[in-house]
Curated annotation (Swiss-Prot):
Pathway: Amino-acid biosynthesis; L-leucine biosynthesis; L-leucine from 3-methyl-2-oxobutanoate: step 1/4
Official protein name in the record: 2-isopropylmalate synthase
The reaction(s) this protein catalyses: 3-methyl-2-oxobutanoate + acetyl-CoA + H2O = (2S)-2-isopropylmalate + CoA + H(+)
Biological function: Catalyzes the condensation of the acetyl group of acetyl-CoA with 3-methyl-2-oxobutanoate (2-ketoisovalerate) to form 3-carboxy-3-hydroxy-4-methylpentanoate (2-isopropylmalate).
CC annotations in GO: cytoplasm
Disulphide connectivity of cysteines: none
Keyword Metal-binding in record: yes
Alphabetic keyword roster: Amino-acid biosynthesis, Branched-chain amino acid biosynthesis, Cytoplasm, Leucine biosynthesis, Magnesium, Metal-binding, Transferase
Chief subcellular location: cytoplasm
NCBIfam families: leuA_yeast (TIGR00970), PRK03739.1 (NF002991)
The family this protein is said to belong to: Belongs to the alpha-IPM synthase/homocitrate synthase family. LeuA type 2 subfamily.
Length: 588
């Protein structure tokens, strides 16, 4: 098939490919052959990078709620602010320290530019802390050097080195604090790799790390400028060109301008990084920082402990939405309201069969479903592991099929419909969705099912219907196996008593109906208990041919024999209703 696409007419002449701006050449890359086997060190920057991107920055109260959430989840390095940039951030850092809010195993991180009065204020904010990371940065990219700072490479190096020296000097003013260092060549992705390595190596020399007290070198995609593999190549190249690699923690800080921050973080980690900075649900400047929730649960679904607790994901989401005053989109990876929901009929059928197969496998092994590997089509994670229920997994609209409808009836009402009945009832539901549009919730599906198969009082169905109603039954059997059936049967406005014999209650009842002038042939019969308890209701499903019409009936009763007879009544009444309705529809 020949493509019919045509040029867009957009001004592509204004833009240069990344490879024409920054050379990243690593033909002997090794990262594609590696596998992730353990979680990286995480640093949550919601309170600094995330907060500065909010239309309405967090109040001190919301900041504290966010900090406490991050601690509960298990983050051990948390960037809590830019204390020299605002009194609000300074006061928040002080409140965490003075109120004893920082657990002993959690290290706060504070950001500062490489200017003396800002560095002095930063160290002042840290007095009394047990330990802290001072995060020093200055911008290094070609564009920033030329447009913002109007200086050369040496000028940028001088800024970084002076900042590092000042940090070491002011460290002496807070001897009670165990100070660690992080340096970021901001706008790293727009910086020549040779220059990025040079400035990082020079800063490391000033900060004097050891293998026991490493310095963090953070290599941010401040603006995402290329595909994730290019970022990974640059990280592997940097790891090879750091003079004191064994004294350095290589950290990643991807932004999501091109929509590939998660991939960039994962590939950069493969390429040799040790640590990743990001925000819950990808909050942050422009299109956001890398999503720590997506990264963590990605690991979890590969059988790797993220070392972060996502077991109450909806609670995490609610808290983040409150603090950020931003909604988490419905399709946000792992956390959105619709990410475990299937509307498509084929997807629903596969999910239903997946649940059934897992239950069967677990039963065969004599274990619970939670003790065997998760394997359900279209659900790469068990929603219950993240605190979700199965209620929203399958939802029904005009795109849905028999699998979704059958799943909801089984999940919510314990009805395990035979396959041909699933097909029949899904057609009934499809007619509703086509006529009314939108989604049909489980409660409405149950109402439709009752109206179609289980004639009931008017407060439970759309309309009272059905020629026949079974009001009482009595059976007896002789030693020869013959069953005698006596029934009280409402036929329209009259109540009749009738009796017949057969090789079982069903056969006898079919004779009763034949005596009433109704020709019924039984094609299939299935029954099951609605629960495992001794007083469980029984559900019976019968496939009938009534006056040449083939359809199903359903009966539910405490007695399985009565349920089977009610199922026959259901099928007969449906056949009669169909013959009444078809002329009405033809006349419309």
């Amino acid at each position: 098939m020949k493509s019919t696409q045509t040029p867009s007419g957009m001004p592509i002449h204004k833009y240069r490919p990344f490879h024409e701006q920054i050379a990243v050449d690593l033909p002997d890359r090794t990262w594609p052959a590696r596998r992730i086997t353990e979680a990286p060190r995480w640093c949550a920057v919601d309170l600094r990078d995330g907060n500065q991107a909010l239309i309405d920055p967090m109040s001190p109260e919301r900041k504290r709620i966010m900090f406490d959430l991050l601690v509960r989840m298990g983050y051990k390095e948390i960037e809590v602010g830019f204390p020299s940039a605002s009194q609000t951030d300074f006061d928040f850092v002080r409140s965490l320290i003075e109120e004893g809010a920082i657990p002993d195993d959690v290290t706060i991180q504070v950001l500062t530019q490489a200017r003396e009065h800002l560095i002095a204020r930063t160290y002042e904010s840290l007095r009394g802390a047990k330990q802290a990371i001072v995060h020093l940065y200055n911008s290094t990219s070609v564009l920033q050097r030329e447009v913002v700072f109007r200086t050369d490479k040496q000028g940028i190096i001088d800024i970084a080195l002076e900042g590092a020296r000042l940090c070491k000097r002011y460290e002496e003013t807070i001897p009670e604090v165990d100070v660690y260092y992080e340096y970021s060549p901001e706008s790293y992705t727009g910086t020549e790799l040779e220059f990025a390595a040079e400035i990082c190596n020079r800063v490391v020399e000033v900060l004097e790390p050891t293998p026991e007290r490493k310095v963090i070198l953070n290599l941010p995609a401040t603006v995402e400028m290329a595909t994730p593999n290019v970022y990974a190549d640059s990280i592997e190249w940097m790891c090879r060109h750091l003079d004191r690699r064994d004294e350095v923690i290589v950290s990643l800080h991807p932004h999501n301008d091109r929509g590939t921050a998660v991939a960039a973080a994962e590939l950069g980690y493969l390429a040799g990084a040790d640590r990743i900075e990001g925000c819950l649900f990808g909050n942050g400047e422009r299109t956001g920082n890398v999503d720590l929730v997506a990264l963590g649960i990605n690991l979890f679904t590969q059988g790797i402990d993220p070392q972060i607790d996502f077991s109450d994901l909806d609670g995490i989401k609610r808290t983040a939405e409150h603090c950020n005053q931003l909604a988490v989109p419905e399709r946000s990876p792992w956390a959105g309201d619709l990410v475990y929901t299937a509307f498509s009929g084929s997807h629903q059928d596969a999910i239903k069969k997946g649940f059934e197969a897992m239950a069967a496998d677990a039963a065969a092994q004599g274990v619970t479903v939670d003790e065997i590997p998760w394997a359900v089509p279209y659900l790469p994670v068990d929603p219950q592991d993240l605190g979700r229920s199965y209620e929203a997994v399958i939802r029904v609209n005009s795109q849905s099929g028999k699998g979704g409808v059958a799943y909801l009836l089984k999940a919510d009402h314990s009805l395990d419909l035979p396959r041909r009945l699933q097909i029949e009832f899904s057609g009934v539901v499809q007619a509703k969705t086509d006529a009314e549009g939108g989604e049909i919730p489980s409660a409405q599906i149950w109402s439709i099912f009752q109206d179609e198969y289980l004639p009931a009082p008017l407060d439970r169905v759309e309309e009272k219907w059905g020629r026949f109603e079974l009001t009482s039954t009595r059976t007896s059997s002789d030693m020869g196996g013959s069953v005698s059936l006596e029934v009280e049967l409402r036929d329209g406005d009259r109540v009749r008593e009738a009796s017949a014999s057969g090789n079982g209650p069903i056969a006898a009842f079919l004779k009763v109906l034949a005596d009433q002038g109704v020709d019924v042939r039984l094609l299939d019969y299935v029954e099951h208990a609605l629960s495992a308890s001794g007083d469980a209701l029984a559900a019976s499903y019968v496939e009938l041919e009534v006056e040449g019409v083939r359809l199903w009936g359903v009966g539910i009763d405490e007695d399985s024999s009565t349920a089977s007879l009610e199922a026959i009544v259901s099928g007969v009444n449906r056949a009669i209703r169909r013959t009444v309705r078809e002329p009405e529809l033809a006349a419309v």
